[in-house]
A protein has these predicted regions:
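A Trp-anchored, charged/polar loop motif used as the substrate-binding/catalytic surface
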Residues: 30, 291-319, 369-377, 462-507
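Active-site His/acidic residue clusters
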Residues: 314, 319-366, 402-406
Length: 735
């Protein structure tokens, strides 16, 4: 869910410059994908937000079951896995950026989302959005996408554009503008005509009459981009700007891009007029103009595009000769669009649905219709499973917070479900700590069901201030307003040492939280403000625990219901396995698998690995064909290195128990987990180059190598498992 990213609305601007094409508008760059048999001509990446393969109510068909046009396309023509996992934390920005890069948050800079805290030099805490354009500086002054060497992490479009392939992006995290005016200034420059116009619109008084004008810059600039190959006619015009990637390995000069609908639509509508309305506005799959709530053509809303909008824009991009397209689709379990409030002229309050509610079912039906039209339209264009690689996934799944469905036999399709109680349970942690523990330690958190804590002054892990707050947070109990049961908020606590093992600590120490509470998934945890009882105990209004009906689907946490998601692949080189859950994978595996199938290569080693179990031998280099050595090493590597593999989950159990124990035991834990992490990282650093070389350099893994590395990995896995399950002496190491 991206409900944390609420942008100020904006105003109609400049921007109707005439096209100055240097070549034919229907031409395209010579895209040189190097797939097996040269069959792949297009790549379509579809990224869902919180759409489920599994059923949330056993009687109600799942989200994907209610989208048979998509589900059948994937299962009949490729492979769908429901044994696919997120990183930690399991929130939208981190999950999508992990998919796009094939790297965990410690390497690409954003392990906490959809915003994250950082410590200033004086020990105070600031916050930055996890959604900014790829090359933007975050609020801490460092690159948003901060690599392990302090540079901007390599961009996902660069291998494609270097191969001569234009890349389109629609609402996909950080590949296009995410914030105005900040991202406009990053690309166009402070004081540029674009910046002046956008800033003027955003600075208009916040009145109902000004709402359309204040929204216009978002409509014009957010959410849409085309990254062009060298010499692409799509960027040979006055709409293009330099596509600057100053830290890209090997250099990246001479490339251009189109940013925002105001610059993209004129170009793709000239190249593919059937996808537009004749006035330069792109149409959705139903034939309506894609527009904001006030009717202005462009990016439709604050990053919650409907299927018909995302797929309609994607189809027009493909028809305009853009062979690689990334698109994002909003979830279907929240009301979308939210009607405008007649008083403020702004979108009204959010509203969440439970499984099987009539409006939820209707929205899924609309998604299904959109996919049917999308696939039919592409097929008519000659874009299909025989020449196109389709990757589809969901950022994370969710835990539903609400009472039981009524009637008990409702299925949503024949009998609609209703819910007497629905909505996440919100808490004010600072007021609960004051009331129950008399703890007034100043801190900030990233609001979430798995909040990251930032203690003012940035005390160390063994500082009494930190140790006391961790124990007091663990001791908090609340009464669930839905069930009337008394419950703990904490489930697992992770300190900095454990977060390092879980790939949650970046190269900038200032971004390191004091600790993370992976909490009870029914609760969304916040801190209070002046209007919500700041400084007052829970005997005073407003309540410290209450049900919020706007949102009912929690994620960010560690529970399998949230972290176990799904992925689907269709296209040349993908086996037709249908539903196949035998292989554990996570989001880092999608990027290397896509790049390998396309015959390209990234400028860095992935944290994931190519999923050869789902690929045809003919699509693989000889080094991977029927390679049991690769498979055995890759599978044990995932259990060793993935946050939700064996080592990650077992170490989290160990960490929680140790953090909440006595100081002497905690000191022993710190030494033990540091040793485990050092050994794990060193072994992973040996394994990753072998997996990469086998996948991208045709260098087979030798059996002797594989046997030795697998034995070492299993020794670490077993060691952590023994420590995690040794309740009597968790510091005793049996190995």
């Amino acid at each position: 869910m991206r409900h944390q990213r609420i942008f100020g609305a904006t105003t109609p601007l400049l921007l109707g410059a005439a096209l100055l094409f240097g070549g034919s508008s229907t031409a395209q760059a010579a895209c040189g994908l190097q797939s097996a048999d040269n069959k792949i001509k297009h790549v379509v990446h579809i990224q869902f937000d919180n759409v489920h393969l599994r059923r949330d109510n056993p009687n109600v068909p799942s989200d994907l079951e209610q989208m048979p046009n998509l589900l059948n396309f994937m299962q009949n023509n490729g492979t769908v896995s429901g044994n696919h996992f997120t990183p930690l934390i399991s929130h939208t920005a981190t999950d999508i950026l992990t998919v796009l890069t094939g790297a965990y948050g410690d390497r690409m800079g954003v392990p906490v989302a959809n915003s994250y805290g950082f410590f200033r030099n004086d020990g105070s805490v600031g916050f930055s959005s996890s959604f900014l354009y790829w090359t933007a500086l975050a609020a801490d002054g460092k690159p948003e996408l901060l690599s392990e060497n302090g540079k901007i992490f390599p961009a996902p479009w660069a291998p494609f554009t270097r191969a001569g392939c234009d890349v389109g992006a629609y609402s996909i995290a950080n590949m296009e503008f995410e914030s105005v005016p900040g991202d406009v200034r990053t690309v166009f420059g402070i004081g540029s005509p674009e910046d002046i116009a956008v800033s003027a619109a955003l600075n208009l008084p916040r009145t109902a009459a000004n709402a359309p004008a204040r929204q216009a810059p978002s409509t014009d600039y957010l959410g849409i981009a085309v990254h062009c190959a060298l010499g692409s006619p799509l960027c040979n015009n006055s709409h293009a700007r330099a596509d600057a990637l100053p830290d890209e390995p090997g250099g990246y000069t001479g490339f251009s891009a189109l940013f925002g609908n105001v610059n993209v639509a004129p170009v793709i509508c000239a190249a593919a007029p059937a996808g537009c309305n004749g006035s330069g506005a792109v149409k959705d799959t139903d034939g309506g103009v894609i527009a904001d709530p006030y009717g202005r053509p462009g990016f439709p809303n604050t990053f919650s595009p409907l299927a018909k909008q995302s797929l309609g824009y994607a189809a027009t991009m493909l028809e305009a000769g853009i062979p690689v397209v990334y698109v994002y689709l909003a979830d279907a379990h929240d009301r979308n669009p939210v009607p405008l409030d007649p008083t403020t002229n702004l979108p009204g309050a959010a509203h969440a649905f439970g499984a099987g509610e009539a409006e939820y079912v209707a929205q899924l039906k609309a998604y299904d219709v959109a996919f049917g039209k999308f696939f039919a339209r592409l097929a008519a264009d000659g874009i299909n499973k025989d020449n196109t690689l389709f990757f589809v996934t969901a950022d994370e799944n969710d835990h539903f917070v609400g009472g039981p469905a009524s009637p008990a036999n409702c299925d949503g399709i024949h009998v609609p479900c209703t819910y007497a109680q629905i909505g996440e349970i919100d808490t004010f942690l600072d007021r609960l700590l004051l009331t129950q523990r008399n703890n007034t330690t100043p801190f900030d958190i990233h609001f979430d069901d798995a909040p990251t804590f930032y203690i003012h002054g940035n005390p160390g892990p063994q500082d009494p201030l930190t140790r006391t707050l961790e124990r007091d947070v663990d001791a908090l109990q609340v009464t669930n307003p839905i069930t009337n049961r008394v419950e703990k908020l904490n489930v697992f606590m992770a300190d900095r040492a454990e977060m390092t093992l879980l790939h949650m600590i970046t190269s900038n120490p200032a971004r390191s939280p004091s600790f993370t509470m992976f909490g009870n998934p029914d609760y969304f945890n916040e801190t209070s403000s002046a209007s919500t009882g700041l400084g007052h105990d829970c005997s005073q209004a407003p309540a410290c625990v209450f049900e919020g009906p706007g949102f009912a689907w929690n994620h960010g946490d560690v529970q399998k219901q949230i972290t176990r998601t799904w992925m689907g692949m269709v296209g040349p080189g993908v086996i037709h396995a249908g539903r196949d859950d035998r292989v554990f994978s996570d989001h880092t595996d999608l990027r290397p698998t896509m790049i390998a199938l396309a015959g390209l290569k990234d400028d860095y080693a992935h944290d994931g690995r190519v999923l050869i179990e789902f690929l045809d031998d003919h699509a693989l280099p000889k080094s991977l064909r029927r390679s049991e050595n690769f498979i055995e090493l890759a599978q044990v590597y995932k259990q060793l290195n993935a946050p939700l593999g064996s080592v990650g989950l077992d170490s989290l159990r160990l960490a929680n128990r140790s953090i909440l124990g006595d100081d002497a035991g905690y000191a022993k834990f710190l030494a033990t987990i540091a040793d485990i992490t050092t050994q794990r990282d060193a072994l992973a650093a040996e394994i990753k180059p072998l997996l990469e070389a086998a996948a991208f350099d045709n260098q087979p893994i030798k059996e002797q190598q594989e046997d030795q590395l697998v034995r070492r990995a299993r020794a670490i896995i077993d060691r952590v498992a023994d420590l995690a399950h040794d309740e009597h002496d968790h510091d005793h190491d049996r190995h």
